[in-house]
Amino acid sequence: MAKVCMVTGKRPISGNNVSHANNKTRRRFYPNLHKHRFWVESENRFVKLKLSAKGFRIIDKKGINIVLTEIRARGKFKESSL
């Protein structure tokens, strides 16, 4: 899963570079992704996730345990994904 947020599902989108002369060339807009280790107290281990900045805020709001159960229910998290 390259360049996809594991929490929000954000992925690259396409658009245009626009020059001062209004010339347009195609480009990709990438999400603001970071790899991060979270300590999961219930499993007594670290879990590595690839997250966007919005994914971090969702984990701050809901908690890592709830977010992990949602990711596993969607089938997007493998134990050796990173």
UniProtKB/Swiss-Prot annotation:
Gene Ontology biological process: translation
What are its GO cellular component terms? cytosolic large ribosomal subunit
Instruction: Name the SUPFAM superfamilies on file.
Output: L28p-like (SSF143800)
Q: Provide the GO MF annotations for this entry.
A: structural constituent of ribosome
Give the disulfide map.
Answer: none
Would the keyword Hydrolase turn up in this protein's UniProt record? no
Kindly state which keywords UniProt assigns to this record, in alphabetical order: Ribonucleoprotein, Ribosomal protein
Keyword Ribosomal protein (UniProt) = yes
InterPro entries, per the entry:
Ribosomal_bL28, Ribosomal_bL28/bL31-like_sf, Ribosomal_bL28_bact-type, Ribosomal_bL28_sf
Q: Name one Pfam family in it.
A: Ribosomal_L28
Q: Which family does it belong to?
A: Belongs to the bacterial ribosomal protein bL28 family.
User: What name has this protein been given in UniProt?
Assistant: Large ribosomal subunit protein bL28
Native organism: Vesicomyosocius okutanii subsp. Calyptogena okutanii (strain HA)
- Gene for this protein? rpmB
